[in-house]
Amino acid sequence: MTGSRRALFLCLLGLGACAATPMETAFLPEFRGFVSIDPVRHSIEQGADMITHRNRLVGQPWETARLVQALEFLAVEVPNGPRWNVMLPMAQLTMPAARAEWRQGFGIAPEARAQEVIDSLTEFRSAFAEQRPAAAPAALRAPLFSPGGQETLNRFADPPALPRTTRALLDARQELISQSFERRAGRNFIIR
């Protein structure tokens, strides 16, 4: 009896150790301290607009970096955020699935954590904002970015077509729109 309890305890302890892997989290620096702006909603709406008008991104690597920051944030927040797994059931599947496409397109290491990518791109964007474009390639260092430096900057200046990512963002935006419509339509619902 005691031996079987001990075995059960050790088995449960082993299972608990497997489940203890921390969930990946990410945040966008421009939303730090803002309570009234929903960073997920904003990232989906702005990202969908940016990715469907790729011509606006050509020659503006800092804007492409902003898009990639939003994508990295969404790939982590939508499936892991407690609110979004109910509100955006398709996006919680399609955003992480599209992640491999944009990471390959921009030379981002497949195993990189989202926050590392976001922080590096914040440094990249800051170099342009501070009118130090010569410092921007240094923020795109290997092994986080491959090959890194100026070659990676060139990818951001002329972003590749990302059909799977585009579809994921457009679907997420549609889910947001339908959620907003359902909430508005439900306001006038009266039970008699």
Regions found by a protein language model. Give the residues of each.
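Mature extracellular/secreted ectodomains of secretory-pathway proteins
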Residues: M50-F189
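Bacterial Sec signal peptide processing site at the extreme N-terminus
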Residues: L15-V35
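Short, solvent-exposed mixed-charge patches
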Residues: C18, F189-R192
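N-terminal export leaders
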Residues: R5-F9, C18
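N-terminal secretory signal peptides that target proteins for export/translocation
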Residues: M1-T2
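Short terminal alpha-helical segments
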Residues: V40-R54
